[in-house]
């Protein structure tokens, strides 16, 4: 019986991974057909970015959502061409939590973000880049689906410190601490804002909006 359970679990992981990759490819293919222009504001990241209707939230038709569920900092580097080539006015980046959940170090996450910043500095230097902190996670709910994520609270804090330091002194780059606006007194993602310990509910996106609204305008 134990072997059957282990086999079923392994098959589930394989199927989930395949489905995730298929979704990633589908979204990338779509984004490659949708041009970015010089007056656009791009939101770039993983499922937490992907899950919001940013243009509607800010009532701004120039906002383009380029979040892809499951994305990681290294994978994100492979899909920058249409974004950098479009020379957007602004870029809001949030990435890294999936890396940490997969065992990637905070140092490597920061290094990949550094590569992104270097590329924009070289190819689209007038784009204003807002690097947002990785959000907190919450594992209080034992039914939380993102168990590999909510064990990474300490790594998230460390990664945010490295990312903030990375942004210092760079032209047209600003680090934004969104983490502090969504964390509770116990150092976890406020339960008002999530239903699975990782992703955001509507109130969570509104709290995020309050932090960055002055930069989006």
List PLM regions with ranges.
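Bacterial Sec-dependent N-terminal signal peptides
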Residues: 1-20
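Catalytic His-Asp segment of secreted/periplasmic serine-dependent ester chemistry enzymes
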Residues: 9-12, 138-217
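Serine-esterase "nucleophile elbow" of acetyl-processing enzymes
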Residues: 18-90
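Surface-exposed cleft-lining segments at the edges of enzyme active sites
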Residues: 65, 97-109, 145-152
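Cell-envelope and extracellular/periplasmic
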Residues: 67-68, 95-100, 114, 134
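Generic structural signal for well-ordered alpha-helices
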Residues: 80, 113-118, 160
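Charged helix-capping and loop-helix junction motifs
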Residues: 106-116, 156
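A short helix->loop->beta-strand "cap" motif at the edges of active sites that frequently abuts
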Residues: 124-128
């Amino acid at each position: 019986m134990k072997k059957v359970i282990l086999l079923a679990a392994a098959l589930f992981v394989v199927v989930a991974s395949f489905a995730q990759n298929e979704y990633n490819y589908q979204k990338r293919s779509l984004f490659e057909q949708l041009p970015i222009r010089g007056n656009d504001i791009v939101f770039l990241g993983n499922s937490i970015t992907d899950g919001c209707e940013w243009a509607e939230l800010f009532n701004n038709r120039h906002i383009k959502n380029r979040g892809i569920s499951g994305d990681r900092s290294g994978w994100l580097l492979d899909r920058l061409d249409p974004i950098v080539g479009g020379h957007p006015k602004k870029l809001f980046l949030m990435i890294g939590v999936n890396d940490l959940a997969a065992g990637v170090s905070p140092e490597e996450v920061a290094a990949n973000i550094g590569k992104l910043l270097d590329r924009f500095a070289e190819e689209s230097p007038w784009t204003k880049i807002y690097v947002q902190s990785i959000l907190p996670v919450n594992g209080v709910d034992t039914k939380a689906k993102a168990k590999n994520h909510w064990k990474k609270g300490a790594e998230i804090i460390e990664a945010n410190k490295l990312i903030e330091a990375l942004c210092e002194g760079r032209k047209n780059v600003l680090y934004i601490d969104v983490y502090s606006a969504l964390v509770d007194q116990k150092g976890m993602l406020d339960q008002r804002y999530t239903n699975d310990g990782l992703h955001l509910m509507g109130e969570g996106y509104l709290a995020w909006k309050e932090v960055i609204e002055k930069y989006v305008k």
